[in-house]
Amino acid sequence: MTDQKHPLLAGLQDATPLANWSSTELSNAAVEIRDVLCNLLATRTAHFASNLGVVELCLALHSEFDFRTDRLIWDTGHQVYPHKLVTGRYDRFETIRTAGGLMGYPNPHESVYDLFMTGHAGCSVSTAVGLRSGDILMDQKDRRTVAVIGDGAFPCGVVFEALNNAGELGDDLTIILNDNKMSICHRTGSVAQYLDRLRGNPFYTGLKHEVTKLLDRVPMFGDPAERLLAQMKEGVKAGLLGGMLFEELGIRYIGPIDGHDIPLMQKYLRLCKETPGPVLLHVVTEKGHGYKPAAEDPVFFHTPPAFEDRGGTPVTRGSDGRPPYTTHARDAIGEAMKRDSRVTVITAAMCQGNKLEPVREQFPERFFDVGICESHAVAFAAGQCKTGMRPIVDIYSTFLQRSYDQIFQEVALQDLPVVFMMDRAGLTAPDGPTHHGVYDIGYMRLFPNLVLMAPGYAEELSMMLDKALTLDHPSGIRYPKASALEATHTPAPIEIGKAEWIREGTDGTIVAYGAMLEQAIAAAEQLEGELEIGVVNARFVKPIDAEMVHKTLSDGRFVVTLEEGTRVGGFGSAFLESAVDQRLDTRAVHRLALPDEFVLHGDRSQLLDQSTLSAQKIAEVCREAASEVGSQVGI
């Protein structure tokens, strides 16, 4: 990136100059932004197509509002790259999604333009309603509030909770519905169909063009001409379409309009500012706009691998050749569905991320993508399960948090054998704290009836799923985004609540839960000739193997527990609870886990090392532990 190549962006310390830029300058800035995005994708995987689609919308917003004092919330936040580029972060943009660099999501620690650190979908309207309410109470009524939410996130239940509240309060608020007909994959559901009807209704499309012509003739808003225009729109729209969903909720609906026409959006944004009460502006955009490969395949280019050229050819990178756990999970699900016609799979808009496309194609009648509606996904699974079906909820660990109450009431309390496949459990590297799946161990093991397990290597994943589908209780299987370790031994059969001993040791034992088994084995191998370290594949955190806990602590040798999850309430805590229940001496237990803080973004191996979870750091802890034990016995 050079100043000569991107002079408009390089000259921005904040977004205030955009208010005085001409249409030509704004259009040129859009070209610069897309060039920067393409340059970035030559170096790393990042959110791409969604950012390409909001370039003009971002420029229009910053040219009409001053978001140093006004409020702007980007729902989910993966589409904030243009926003970062025009708010003074151009010079640091090449650090995005790298350790110590810019986050790939909004981050208040970076800029006053970012209000919330986000990454999950659906809450923008709620926080915007709250911001507006608070500003009114704090006598800050001149501050304007804008929420930008995509049509993929719009069906979230919390969105309609917010609209319900916004309509009742009646406070001034602008909601931008960024409609690109996509979530990560193609969106699903009746809300999507409703938005399609709004986009395609020939009567309203004609009305839109007439309103556009009138807008062109009205230089300023807030006068009788504007009010007349608004009344005309309301009357004609009501006559053509009847009572519309948003209008019936007390939300003024405007649109749909072209989300790539900056002057047009500027005029409509001014209309929104002058319209009293909550307003929803329906903006139609194209995901991947301005870059042909992304526009033609927005699913692949949502977060594509790094480019080899501007044609979108992926860079060939070195690989350990091992498929990720996600691939093994998909294959195990497919095999289970072949064997048993009662097995279904439910995902919440993560078909691509969970690599479920082959399952969807082979078993379309038993595949359910419910959209970004995790609470519904879990309750829906409970309903299926009650009829005798065997549903699998295939979901990212961090997104399962959104359905906590449904796990409690609809599944655990009913003791229904729903299977939760918790993908992306552990560190998700460059996505940062909103996407790390580090809390599921703690919050899932709280519930009675739930059986919780984690594979230490690839072969175990299918074994665990097969076992889970035989249970009469709910169960969860956690696994990371990482490539899967392949067993070098014949795996022991899966027995509920039983660990697997990988190797015996005379000096101490490492007890690893899940994918941390790979680091445990590597650490033990590093110490060969120095210490004889046993390695245990815990397999279960609930019920934990009490006999294994007793055996590892019975001879006074040290024990190191490993988990790719938070230290509080995790596997190490479960290990100590079992030890205390058995009245065992726990002084030689060392818990290695992620710290009790929000882990930022970076390379997974780097983050593991920082958290004392790399093989090298684990080996160092073992040396220290052995020394402590030796000094205690007088050696």
Swiss-Prot record:
Binding site for thiamine diphosphate: H78, G119, H120, A121, G152, A153, N180, Y291, E374
Metabolic or biological pathway, per its Swiss-Prot or TrEMBL entry: Metabolic intermediate biosynthesis; 1-deoxy-D-xylulose 5-phosphate biosynthesis; 1-deoxy-D-xylulose 5-phosphate from D-glyceraldehyde 3-phosphate and pyruvate: step 1/1
Entry keywords, A to Z: Isoprene biosynthesis, Magnesium, Metal-binding, Thiamine biosynthesis, Thiamine pyrophosphate, Transferase
Subunit-structure text: Homodimer.
Region (Disordered): 305-325
NCBIfam families: dxs, PRK05444.2-2
Known function: Catalyzes the acyloin condensation reaction between C atoms 2 and 3 of pyruvate and glyceraldehyde 3-phosphate to yield 1-deoxy-D-xylulose-5-phosphate (DXP).
SUPFAM superfamilies: Thiamin diphosphate-binding fold (THDP-binding) (SSF52518), TK C-terminal domain-like (SSF52922)
Biological process (GO), any one: thiamine biosynthetic process
UniProt family annotation: Belongs to the transketolase family. DXPS subfamily.
Catalytic reactions on record: D-glyceraldehyde 3-phosphate + pyruvate + H(+) = 1-deoxy-D-xylulose 5-phosphate + CO2
Annotated GO MF terms: 1-deoxy-D-xylulose-5-phosphate synthase activity; magnesium ion binding; thiamine pyrophosphate binding
Cofactor binding comment, as recorded: Binds 1 Mg(2+) ion per subunit.
A Gene Ontology term for the protein's cellular component: cytosol
Protein's name in the database: 1-deoxy-D-xylulose-5-phosphate synthase
Positions contributing to Mg(2+) binding: D151, N180
SMART domains: Transket_pyr
Source organism phylogeny: Bacteria, Pseudomonadati, Planctomycetota, Planctomycetia, Pirellulales
Assigned EC number: 2.2.1.7
Cofactor(s), names only, from the UniProt record: Mg(2+); thiamine diphosphate
The organism of origin for this protein: Rhodopirellula baltica (strain DSM 10527 / NCIMB 13988 / SH1)
Pfam families, per database record: DXP_synthase_N, Transket_pyr, Transketolase_C
